[in-house]
Design a protein with these regions (language model features):
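Short, amphipathic alpha-helical "recognition" segments used to contact nucleic acids or chromatin
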Residues: 105-117
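Mobile genetic element proteins and their domesticated derivatives, centered on retroelements
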Residues: 35, 39, 74, 86, ...
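Short, conserved DNA-binding cores of transcription-related domains
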Residues: 2-97, 177
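Conserved beta-strand -> loop -> alpha-helix junction used to position metal-binding or nucleic-acid-contacting
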Residues: 232-239, 244-280
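Metal-dependent DNA phosphodiester-chemistry modules and their immediately adjacent helices/loops
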Residues: 79, 90, 265-301
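RNase H-like nuclease fold core
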Residues: 76-88, 92-101, 105, 131-234, ...
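DNA-recognition alpha helix
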Residues: 121-133
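Acidic/histidine-rich catalytic cores and adjacent linkers
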Residues: 1-10, 14, 37-40, 45, ...
């Protein structure tokens, strides 16, 4: 078979630079053809054929509607919808419903682009670049998205959670400027580590970070919806969660966040000495045993006292026993249990979004948008290491310095 390699043919072939436009044009032609075939099947005849004199089928073509733009994930195309008259019911294409201006895939893409830290003016620019200058988008489309997120959030916030086998909880609050309030509102957030190794967003509710009552309300609500007692809760020492935990889940063990503690201690050290102090401090939570962590703590405090930094030495002592709780859990899980990074990492995306949160007049609107952001981030949450050990932890296995303590097989004689 010979190929036509004439200059005219070669010039008409798409290049890498024009490939997307070539593909869009092909899709546009194909979809226009499908629209025509829909009408042919409905009327039982081709565009140029006359109606049969024997039992003619009702209905006839009546030109085309106005050109319609349809946003696809690879750009925007223009289609002409055939019009049909003389039918008892209005003809509506299954391929292109009357008011549909974008595909379902683009509908899914819109909230993700909007939520990934784009201000509204940049959001519009980004979509124009992706979907083409003719993309049919409007402020009303974004408003409908926000309303849909609010409705989704309300359903999600009342869902049963009894099917979740929760082992660990990470808790924290993020402050956002929302509404007309003078003070920033906090979004109290709970992320759960499950027996299968997944991490999931469990609760996102507005409230005060240090409020025992606010955290108690969250825990009571989760308990009423089926949450069982977690084995360990990780959070900042200043949170009201600890008083709430004593009220609702007193059996749960507590781990204070090392990131917050190190920052608090360094605040008591002059800037010119912080580099050396940080080097000594960061070694403490990475000690292989609790005993070594205790020694490194004493070494740091001795370093502080030589430099008359009593406040820093004392700050490290605060709530010390709850800084070491993670040693009573599998060593494979320590990476996850030392800090609240599990919450703070996805909030890095949230903070991009909340730089513009002051335009939200209501805290509820900010809550819904941030919740949606976290739910998107949840898809890429890192799974817990050694998930096979989570069932042991859930069943009450004891660990010392990260190693499981075997139950005594023989009873000691009385």
């Amino acid at each position: 078979m010979q190929h036509d390699n004439t200059p005219e043919t070669v010039a008409s072939m798409p290049s890498w630079e024009t490939l997307e436009g070539f593909a869009r044009h092909g899709v546009q032609q194909l979809l226009q053809q499908v629209l025509e075939e829909e009408v042919e099947q409905l009327l039982g005849r081709r565009k140029s054929e006359r109606r049969s004199a024997v039992d003619p089928q009702r209905g006839y073509r009546n030109g085309y509607g106005k050109p319609r733009q349809l946003a696809l994930t690879n750009g925007t195309i223009v289609l002409r919808r055939p019009r049909v008259r003389g039918l008892e019911e209005r003809f509506e294409s299954r391929l292109l419903p009357l008011f549909r201006r974008r595909t379902q895939e683009v509908g899914t893409l819109l909230p993700e682009l909007y939520l990934h830290g784009l201000a509204e003016r940049d959001f519009d620019l980004a979509l124009r670049g992706l979907l083409g200058d003719g993309a049919p988008l409007s402020a009303a489309s974004i408003a409908r998205l926000k309303a849909a997120w609010q409705a989704e959030y309300e359903v999600w916030n009342s869902r049963p959670v009894n099917d979740l086998e929760v082992v660990y909880l990470w808790v924290d609050g993020i402050y956002v400027k929302a509404g007309l309030e003078k003070d920033k509102a906090a979004l109290l957030t709970v992320i759960a580590g499950l027996q299968d190794g997944r991490k999931v967003v469990l609760a996102v509710t507005s409230g005060h970070r240090e409020s025992v009552e606010g955290w108690s309300a969250i825990l009571r609500d989760l308990k009423a919806r089926g949450l069982t007692t977690p084995k360990l809760v990780v959070g900042d020492g200043n949170l009201g969660i600890w008083g709430a935990l004593a009220n609702v889940f007193p059996e749960a063990k507590e781990q204070r966040c090392w990131n917050h503690r190190l920052m608090n201690v360094l605040d008591q050290v002059p800037k010119k000495q912080q580099a050396q102090a940080r080097q000594l401090l960061t070694k403490i939570p990475y000690a292989e045993t609790q005993e070594l962590a205790e020694k490194r703590k004493r070494d740091f405090q001795a370093w502080c006292r030589k430099r008359h930094l009593e406040a820093a030495a004392k700050r490290l002592d605060d709530d010390w026993e709850r800084m070491l709780t993670f040693y009573g859990f599998p060593q494979e899980h320590w990476l996850h249990l030392r800090t609240t990074n599990v919450v703070e990492s996805p909030f890095a995306v949230v903070r991009l979004r909340t730089t513009a949160a002051k335009r939200y007049r209501k805290v509820a609107n900010a809550t819904a948008v941030i919740w949606k952001t976290l739910r998107i981030a949840e898809r890429s949450f890192r799974r817990l290491n050694a998930p096979e050990l989570l069932a042991e932890v859930a069943n009450g296995a004891n660990y010392s310095n990260g190693v499981r303590v075997k139950a005594t097989q023989e009873r000691v004689p009385a």
